[in-house]
Every structure is written in structure tokens, then in C-alpha cells.
Amino acid sequence: MKRAMPFIISGMMKLTIGIATCLLLLFCLVLLQQSSNIFNHHKSVFTKELDEDSCLSRYPSSLYRKTSPYKPSQHLISKLRRYEMLHKRCGPGTEAYKSATEKLGHNHVSNSGDECRYVLCVSPLSGLGLGNRMISMVSMFLYALLTERIMLVDQRIDTSDLFCEPFPGTSWFLPLDSPLMDQLDSFNREYSRCYGTMLKNHCINSTTIPSQLYLYLFHDYGDHDQMFFCEDKQMIIGKVPWLVAKSNQYFVPSLWLIPSFLTKLIKLFPQKDTVFHHLSRYIFHPTNQVWGMVTRSYIAYLSRTDERLGIQGSLKSMYWEHPTLTGAVVVVHQPSQEAHQQSDKKLHNKKTLAEMYLLSMTDEVVISASSTFGYVAQGMGGLKSWILYEPVNHTVPDPPCGRAISMEPCFHVPPVYGCKGKTGTNTGNIVPFVRHREDRILGIKLVQDTS
């Protein structure tokens, strides 16, 4: 009997292995079919030229979320394909890029209209959270799409550790040997080529076009910096070959208030509150290391749950100290295990990005007021979050939370200029699809116009 047992176990093991193998093969076939369906659904958003192995998150990420009800327009799809061709023609390493770089040595340029033009997205080397970086990069990319520019990004920080290259056959990183590289830290509001400063000093007009222009679009920008959002000023800015931009804002809503952009935007985004949803999913794909963090956490903690609630906040100790009223089991998972954002630490930023992605994979999400971290998660997930309002004079608001009016991020500090000489313009009352946000009277955001 003792000798028979191993054979029985062995037979059971073989049967178990056989069943497991069949299930695994079936799962792989389903996964391949789903991946095929994903590509067919997004075939115009994600080109076949992109290498799947070098960026494992690009296609399978949709498997971890519910199917998005928001479909990209054909105009957006075509625009992205044309942009990819333009980036491939004008990107780093090309003759066109070399020719454009040579212009940086000139004070002024004459623009024939057929040269490549660029917008360089620069982030401070410290002090700027990942959420702010991501919402400003989406804003810059939309601006690049609207103005036929190539968007490049600063590679001195950890962008390459966080995100895959989004465009096929080329790079979006400013080369380290670029003449601009040594100047990046000197770009500030006092810089001689700062747009606001030049405008204030009457040093820029339609006949004197500088080879480069610095755009200061941070929350504390001045009145002259804010003139960037004026139609007539865009006509001049559009002729400058190189724009270097620093921002911590999601300034997309104000682009909709520029008449020449509005006609293009309506075609690209018929559903106006899907800008961040579509563009963030297009340009942001976690590197394999970050994607590994996401998938491991998802499989271990989220894959077998009936309903997933994402909360952007520190709640773990709450459920240790206070049971639920109904006795229901609440399990809180936080990959980074860090209560405060540490924007200068590369590993922390990887964990932060992983958490953003995990939040975007939930069924419902609750975020704190003014949280760019939360904005990224809700936008990528296509979710209208519940927003926890900030206390006023140490008093909890009534109600304490409310539903977001759209899944778009908020432009916290929109311009209050008047492009036609008016001051104190209320940018939340100009068009019905740009409104004041739910919990910040000065901020504005895009909504789907139902009027």
C-alpha cells in the first residue's frame, strides 16, 4: 500500500498538471484574442511600428481596466499618425533636427514656413511632483499637436526610468549634446528670452522673431506671461523655431479659449472632457520595471475582488483602529507604503506611478481636493471621481465630498488677463464647456457641453 501511494499521487499530479496546462493554454489564447481586440480597437492609436517587448505595458494595460466607453475620434487618430510621421522626420538624429539646432546660435531668424519647429518640455530638477509633471506634459503635447510642433522632453530627470518612448522610430528626449542643455537651469522669469519679459519690454513683434523663446507657465506667472493664451500673440509665437516651456499646470482648458485652436479641438475631441483620457493613454506607458510593480500588485490584491474602490489618501491605520459599522472586511493596499510624496527619489517616483495606474484600474475613485496625483488616476481610468473637499477654518464642509463634473484635470491658476485690453476676465464664464471646478472657485476645467 505504501508503494502504491506514490503512483496514485503521481497520477493525480499528472492529471492536475494536464488540467493546469490546458487552462493555461486556454488563458493564453484568450489573452492573445483580447490583445488582438485591444489592438484592433486602438489600432489607429497605437501603431504597429512600436516594439511590444521593450514596453510591456503599451497594449496589455487595457486588459486591467474596464473597456473605456470613450472612443477616440477619427480626426484624433489621423492627427496622431501625422504627428508620428512629423516626429520621425524632425526628431533627434535627423538632418532636419540638425538644421533646426544650428538656428539656436542666431539671435533672430526668418521663417520660411517649412522648417521643423519644437517645444521642449522642461521640469525643474527638484520640487515638482509627478502628477504635476504629467498633466503639464499632456498640455504641452496637445499644444504641439495644435501647432505642428515636435515635443521633446528633458532627460536629465527620471522620465526615461518611468515611461517608454511613445513615438515609433525616434526619441522624444532632447539629446545631451544639444546647445540648449547647458542653458536649461538658467531659464527663469528674468531670462532675457522669457516671453513675458520680452513682451513687457516690447522686444518681440512680427518682424523680430527670436530663434528661441522661454515660456513660463507656472502657477505664479505674471500678466505678460499669461498673454501666451491670446490669439494675436500665438500668431507671433508660432513663428519661433524653438520654444522652451516650464509649467506645473494643466492649461488645456485655456487652449480651448483660443479661437484658431477651438475649431481644431472640436474636431479632435467631440466629447470635450476626454482630452486627458485619450492623450495620457497615448503618451504615458510605464517602463517594464514600473509595469512589473503594477501587475504584481494587481494580481496579488485586486484581480479576485468583486469591486475595487480607489482612495487617494492614508487610510490603513483607520481600519486598524476603527471597525466598519457593518462588520464588512476592508483591506487597504498601498504599494509605496509612504505617506508623503518624495519627488526627488527615483524609486519613489516609480512606486508613485505604479499607484497612479492601480488607482486608474478601480471601479470608483475618491481623491483629495486639488490633487494632481488623483487627476492622473481618474483621467487615465476614465472615471469621474468623488472629491473630498478641503476643510474651511478647520471645519468639515457640508457636504464633505461631491462628484466631479468631469474626468478632466483642473487648471488651478488660469489667466485673469483680458486679451483685448480687459482685466479680471472670468475664464469660467466664457464658453459652456469650460467651467469653474467643483471645489476651487478660481480653477477651471473642461466639461462635456450638454447645452
Residue ranges and their predicted role:
Residues V392-S451:
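Leloir-type glycosyltransferase catalytic cores
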Residues S314-A339, G382-S385, N393-T395:
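Active/binding-pocket-proximal capping segment
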Residues F7, H322-T362:
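Donor nucleotide-activated moiety binding/catalytic core segment of transferases
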Residues P124-L128, N349, E364:
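Active-site rim elements
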Residues A4-T21:
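N-terminal Sec-pathway targeting helices
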Residues L145-I157, S368-A369, M380-C410:
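Gly/Pro- and small hydrophobic-enriched strand-loop and loop-to-helix capping segments
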Residues G18-K316, T326:
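Secretory-pathway glycan-assembly enzymes, especially type II membrane glycosyltransferases
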Residues V138, T352-T395:
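A donor-sugar binding/catalytic signature common to diverse glycosyltransferases
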